Amino acid sequence: MTKEKANESPLACNLGAMTVKQRERHRTLGRELRESVAEIRELPEGFEFLLPSKAWAMAAEFVALERLCCPFVRFRLDLKEEGGPCRLTLTGREGVKEFLRLELGLTARLPL
């Protein structure tokens, strides 16, 4: 086993990594973000969510909390110029995409 593999966290949410207050906020943010999503794109290693520009701060706060319980997910928040939409990308190593598909309820295949 390589040193990198030995340091990988398991593909499982660790909600114990957050306080009760953080979990409540995480749940609220997740619900609000899901309601804000304009489009979901399936990527080879994960998913991309198109959000209105006003959702960037909410997305950033969500990522900060999500990283506590799911450190194996790679996050990218892209803010377009001129107040354009923002994109939240969730990707990761092998197995992360299927984990995200199940956790986010994306059971149907999306067009690549």
What feature does the model see in each segment?
Residues R76, K80-L104:
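Short, compact, well-ordered microdomains
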Residues T2-E45, F72, E94-L112:
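Long, contiguous binding/interaction regions
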Residues L51, A60-V63, R67-L79:
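Amphipathic, hydrophobic secondary-structure cores in small proteins
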Residues A55-E61, G95-L100:
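Short, conserved charged micro-motifs
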Residues E45-L51, L88-L90:
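Generic recognition of long tandem-repeat/solenoid scaffolds
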Residues L51-P52, W56, R109:
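Long, contiguous secondary-structure blocks with strong helical propensity
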